[in-house]
Structures are given as structure tokens and as C-alpha cells.
């Protein structure tokens, strides 16, 4: 894996703050990749499902709702999820404060492509690639043995404490959600967790995304189209500014976040484990000229050093294994080299292409 970026890193936030009237060429996407701000689906009021987890946990009908959302969309919003609302607001606010710090303070945590940990502004190491209009901060969270304390920001005050508290609440949510997803697939509650490597062996990471104002939002993206490489993603969205779009057929649906909701999406590893019953779905982020956005993505992933393939009970004569097994660390390394690229990586594992 590369240990340095192919070109000098430029903070997109700093670039935006200079008041540039146009988007520099390195951020201008090819015409077919540029954002769509109004789609037929959005105009028709089509939105991803919203699940009240009080109606889901431990209830047969709840399992059917989860399965329907995962099969039809690969995305859903959840309310009454158990994560403290005030904690959600405080950790989001702390990260917003971090990104308002002077650039020299943020650069103390500058990242490199070997681990991605820390403060950065690009994904992938392909030279001369078209870049996204965003900055981010990436942290390893689980297992705790791989955390790098030197990469955890010390400013603003209490941000480390908030990261720890938020991470712990979302970890518990992921464990419960993994049981529910397992049952929704017709498996024993603990089967999916076992396939991920076991509760104390799973991986997790946190990426905070910062999307600055953009002078020409129609020419670029905050995050290019991709599916998430891991197991499950729990997103704490910016409630004030929309931007996340989910692919629906040939178009895109802009998610309208519900107050105090978290957004769940299926990752590539769960698509593989479910033998294609549940599918990771392409999504992207659009930017705007008037407001900045902050969101927090918590990635719940398989243990990195075990092969991940279709769960045995989900392989039948009528539905043979669709994917080649692959270790998550190998899969993630390929993603990190290429950067966001639709669903090309998971599709490359299909046994009958």
C-alpha cells in the first residue's frame, strides 16, 4: 500500500474560504458523473423507509420491515434507536468546531494512504484522479488494540470523550442491529455476528465528513458514487442541509433526514455474506453554494483477517454461492487504492460474470 499521496494535499475547506469563483479543474467531474439535483423520484416524493425501532426490536413484523427495506433499498432511517439525542448533537457540534480550527492545527493529524487515519482531503491514490469537494477525519475504533491515540484530536475540549461515548453507543446499536439483520435473513440471531468474526473481533471505524461551500456545485461532488466496503454503516447526518443521494434505478433520490434519526445502509460485506439477498447500494453526496455540511459515518466491519464469503445456510441448489471469499483487509486495501468507484469492487467477486 502506498505510504504517501501522489500529489500535494489541498484542504478543500481552505480553498473554499479563499472565495474562489470557479471550481479548480482537478475537482470538475466528467459530464456523466456530475450531480443531478432534481430527479423524478424526488419530485414524486419517493423516500427511503423510516423505521421506528420500537416497532422492530423483537417483533416478527419488525423483521419483515427490515428485510423489505434491505431488499428494496439497502438504506433506511431509524428513529427510537437508543443513541442519546443530546450526544448526537454534541458530537456533531464538536466535529464542526474541529473543522473550524486553524489549518495548521488540523494538519497536526494529517493522514497518509497506508491507514487513512487522521485529517485528509482525498480518497484513493490514483495520480491525476478527479477529486471530491470535501475534507474528512478518519479514525480506527475497533478493535481497541488498533487505535492510534496520537491521531485522536485534542481540540476542541472533550472531543475525545465525545468520540468515545458516541462510539460506544453506536457499537451497542450495531450489535443489536446485527442480530436483527441475521433474524431477518432467516438465520439464528448470533449467526451474522459469528460470520463477522465475533463481537470482540469485529472492526469499526469513524469518518467525519466536512463538505465546504462550493462556487459551482453542478460541476462536482462532495463524495463520488460508491457503495460502502464494510458490513453496516450508521450515518449521523447533518439535519439542516441535505446532500446524501441514493441510487434508485437510473436516477438519484436525495434523502430528507428525519429529526433525531440515524441512517443505516448495507455494505459490500453484508451483500457477500447474504449471498446477494441484501445488496449494498450506490450513493453519493452533492454540495451547495450556500451552506457547509457535517456528517459522521460509523463503519461496522468484519474481522479483517478472515475470509468473508456467503453464509452456508444462504447457499442452496436454487441459489448457489455468488461471490468468491475474500479477507476484509484485502478488500479494503483495493478500495483504498482506487477510491470511490461505484460497485465495481464487489461485482469483481461474482463467480458467474
Curated annotation (Swiss-Prot):
Keyword ATP-binding recorded: no
UniProt EC number: 1.14.11.-
GO MF entries: dioxygenase activity; iron ion binding; jasmonic acid hydrolase
Cofactor: L-ascorbate; Fe(2+)
Presence of keyword tRNA-binding: no
Catalytic activity from the UniProt record: jasmonate + 2-oxoglutarate + O2 = (1R,2R)-12-hydroxyjasmonate + succinate + CO2
Binding locations of Fe cation: 226, 228, 283
Domain Fe2OG dioxygenase: 202-302
GO process terms (BP): defense response; negative regulation of defense response to insect; regulation of defense response to fungus; regulation of jasmonic acid mediated signaling pathway
Entry protein name: Jasmonate-induced oxygenase 4
Lineage per the UniProt record: Eukaryota, Viridiplantae, Streptophyta, Embryophyta, Tracheophyta
Amino acid at each position: 500500500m502506498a505510504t504517501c499521496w501522489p500529489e500535494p494535499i489541498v484542504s478543500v475547506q481552505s480553498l473554499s474560504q479563499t472565495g474562489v469563483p470557479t471550481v479548480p479543474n482537478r475537482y470538475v467531474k466528467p459530464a456523466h458523473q456530475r450531480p443531478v439535483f432534481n430527479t423524478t423520484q424526488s419530485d414524486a416524493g419517493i423516500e427511503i423507509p423510516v423505521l421506528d425501532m420500537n416497532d422492530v426490536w423483537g417483533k416478527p413484523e419488525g423483521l419483515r420491515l427490515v428485510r423489505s427495506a434491505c431488499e428494496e433499498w439497502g438504506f433506511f432511517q431509524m428513529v427510537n434507536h437508543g443513541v442519546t439525542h443530546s450526544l448526537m448533537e454534541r458530537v456533531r457540534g464538536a466535529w464542526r468546531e474541529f473543522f473550524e480550527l486553524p489549518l495548521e492545527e488540523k494538519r497536526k493529524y494529517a493522514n497518509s494512504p497506508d491507514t487513512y487515519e487522521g485529517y485528509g482531503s482525498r480518497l484513493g491514490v490514483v495520480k491525476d484522479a478527479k477529486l471530491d469537494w470535501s475534507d474528512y477525519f478518519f479514525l480506527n475504533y475497533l478493535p481497541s488494540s488498533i487505535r492510534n491515540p496520537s491521531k485522536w484530536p485534542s481540540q476542541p475540549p472533550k472531543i475525545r470523550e465525545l468520540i468515545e461515548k458516541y462510539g460506544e453507543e453506536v457499537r451497542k446499536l450495531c450489535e443489536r442491529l446485527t442480530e436483527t439483520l441475521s433474524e431477518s435473513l432467516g438465520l439464528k440471531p448470533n449467526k451474522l455476528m459469528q460470520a463477522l468474526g465475533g463481537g470482540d473481533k469485529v472492526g469499526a471505524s469513524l469518518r467525519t465528513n466536512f463538505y465546504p461551500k462550493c462556487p459551482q456545485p453542478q460541476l462536482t461532488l462532495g463524495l463520488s458514487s460508491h457503495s460502502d466496503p464494510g458490513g453496516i454503516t450508521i450515518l449521523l447526518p447533518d439535519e439542516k442541509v441535505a446532500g446524501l443521494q441514493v441510487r434508485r434505478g437510473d436516477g438519484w433520490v436525495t434523502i430528507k433526514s428525519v429529526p433525531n434519526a440515524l441512517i443505516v445502509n448495507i455494505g459490500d460485506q453484508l451483500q457477500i455474506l447474504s449471498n446477494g439477498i441484501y445488496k449494498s447500494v450506490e450513493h453519493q453526496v452533492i454540495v451547495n453554494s450556500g451552506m457547509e455540511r457535517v456528517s459522521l459515518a460509523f463503519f461496522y466491519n468484519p474481522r479483517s483477517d478472515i475470509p468473508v464469503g456467503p453464509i452456508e445456510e444462504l447457499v442452496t441448489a436454487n441459489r448457489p454461492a455468488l461471490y468468491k471469499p475474500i479477507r476484509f483487509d484485502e478488500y479494503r486495501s483495493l478500495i483504498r487504492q482506487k477510491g470511490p468507484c461505484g460497485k465495481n469492487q464487489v461485482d469483481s467477486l461474482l463467480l458467474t460474470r
